[in-house]
Amino acid sequence: ILEGTPGAGMGILLMLISLSLFVIGFTMGGLNYMITILQARTRGMTLMRMPLTVWGIFTATVLAMLAFPALLVSAIMMTLDKVLQTSFFMPTILKAGEVLEYGGGSPILFQHLFWFFGHPEVYIVALPAFGIVSDLISVHARKNIFGYRMMVWAIVGIGALSFFVWAHHMYVSGMNPWFGFFFATTTLIIAVPTAMKVYNWILTLWRGNIRIN
């Protein structure tokens, strides 16, 4: 890969190596989270009785286990492009009128791999926060969360849909218009479970025993 800015040499290589180590480390930690939630719950704690915070953490962990491998693969491919002069992401390039020895690569492939990780990553951050907000509202309204099962399925639905919206970051990349239409539609659909959560928060607060002191 051509060096264009200061730090684009060894700095980029170290960043790619650190990303790879991060994904490997998270995979071990993520498996720990998933197995603990599925196999080490206390007696009587069924899945549909777990706090919504735990549901948020569990769903976010599943998302990370599915999304981070795309980041790992893209980091490895970019490292190979940089070190071994492969052409995963490098198209044919002209330099001072001379064709460099690259060919067949696609920068768009890197965008797809990055955003396949990048958009679920938004919900990896957000879903545990949604769960915390749900439990805090329930505690301080002094009533059970409104529509608990609906809230659980909303968390799961947001997580599932997050894998079908990544290309809405790439509308100007020259993708097929029908491809763009599909991702625009899924982007609109993901607003439905999100709105369900907000309305359930409001209904939990409605006539709750809230004290501000």
List each model region and its residues.
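Membrane-embedded and interfacial regions of multi-pass energy-transducing membrane proteins
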Residues: I1-N213
